[in-house]
């Protein structure tokens, strides 16, 4: 029998509502906005086709393989309530379509060409179900939450961080001084800003040396293990690894990477190096809002978070529910759970479309940062719990008396909140009172409370269900 040339509807091949999903399938939930006149079944089938085996016309080489075995299948469609002409389309992909241990390949398939497809007005990948058969091919985070706590010898509370500001323009020596003051004051970590790489005013090697000196000095004086996220992000993978090697030689505990601008291949490479050499890996998500901020087009951050857990990172910025950078509470807590927990049940009220079983892949600490200060501490402690990093940049360095008192204020506020919680007090209701009580015996905290008592960033969150 000759093959039948020509263009035929995608839905004839790729829309299979009777399909029963397999445990090994990768499942995707897309928010699809078809062009006017395109039925949802055709749009859903087109997404399945273009992100797996299909092309725009029938080709004779289709006969050389088993399409039934390899094709993506649109198996369910539901309308989005309250939105006109918007659908959630569920697609199942056979596992054979993906290279083992490669987030890069997974994304190239699932969100490659299909987002430019003309029959769709807009397309957003809302969630992915990664089957254990696939997640087991990834190393995941270099160390994970428990190993990190054991390395740092810090338990029972969130960790405190601070991004050194101004983010660009300081010399290496002045930068190191700021790091020392913050760590000496009581923070656990300080952080390179995501755009600090190796610029003319401060080359990476000088920064690494002065930060290591600051770290060891603060450690000796406080008796606590300290860290500074040394940003190893670079223009090439080789240069990035060179920086990570130097960090290891200095004996520091943690390095950092910008995983979206650096790319998943570079990130996974660095993650492997970090596990092999005992370095923790802090991940910044610079550029994420370009991809995830539009409600009807792009990729939701919960997918980028899952991808990071597979690719590898011990911390990742996860947005906050208070402060200057947006995050909607239930949705944020949904992907915070996806980062930390072993098994996360489907829960549409939190934007989780699939039950995700990570089969003991190490967890990632969510990092809350962006416009937060001491008055937010009770809310942050309650919302994020112990397994998190709370990062105050301006909220430390903006203290009227300087960096070290700023760090003291944050540490006192945190310890007060943790103690109050452990005594059974309600942080949501009594938060301000707890901070006020603590500030009576901490002049540093009292000064911080005075400076930031009126500051609010109140805008509508873009990211709603």
From Swiss-Prot:
SUPFAM superfamilies: RuBisCo, C-terminal domain, RuBisCO, large subunit, small (N-terminal) domain. The keyword Plastid applies. It catalyses: 2 (2R)-3-phosphoglycerate + 2 H(+) = D-ribulose 1,5-bisphosphate + CO2 + H2O; D-ribulose 1,5-bisphosphate + O2 = 2-phosphoglycolate + (2R)-3-phosphoglycerate + 2 H(+). InterPro entries: RuBisCO, RuBisCo_large_chain_AS, RuBisCO_lsu_C, RuBisCO_lsu_C_sf, RuBisCO_lsu_fd_N, RuBisCO_lsu_N_sf, RuBisCO_lsuI. GO terms for cellular component: chloroplast. Substrate binds at residues 163, 167, 285, 317, 369. It is found in: Plastid, Chloroplast. One of its GO terms (molecular function) is magnesium ion binding. The disulfide bond which can form in the large chain dimeric partners within the hexadecamer appears to be associated with oxidative stress and protein turnover. Its cofactor is Mg(2+). The keyword Magnesium applies. The active site is at 165 (proton acceptor), 284 (proton acceptor). Its main location: plastid. Keywords: Calvin cycle, Carbon dioxide fixation, Chloroplast, Disulfide bond, Lyase, Magnesium, Metal-binding, Methylation, Monooxygenase, Oxidoreductase, Photorespiration, Photosynthesis, Plastid. GO terms for biological process: photorespiration; reductive pentose-phosphate cycle. Belongs to the RuBisCO large chain family. Type I subfamily. The basic functional RuBisCO is composed of a large chain homodimer in a 'head-to-tail' conformation. In form I RuBisCO this homodimer is arranged in a barrel-like tetramer with the small subunits forming a tetrameric 'cap' on each end of the 'barrel'. RuBisCO catalyzes two reactions: the carboxylation of D-ribulose 1,5-bisphosphate, the primary event in carbon dioxide fixation, as well as the oxidative fragmentation of the pentose substrate in the photorespiration process. Both reactions occur simultaneously and in competition at the same active site. Heterohexadecamer of 8 large chains and 8 small chains; disulfide-linked. The disulfide link is formed within the large subunit homodimers. This is Ribulose bisphosphate carboxylase large chain. It comes from Trochodendron aralioides. The gene is rbcL.
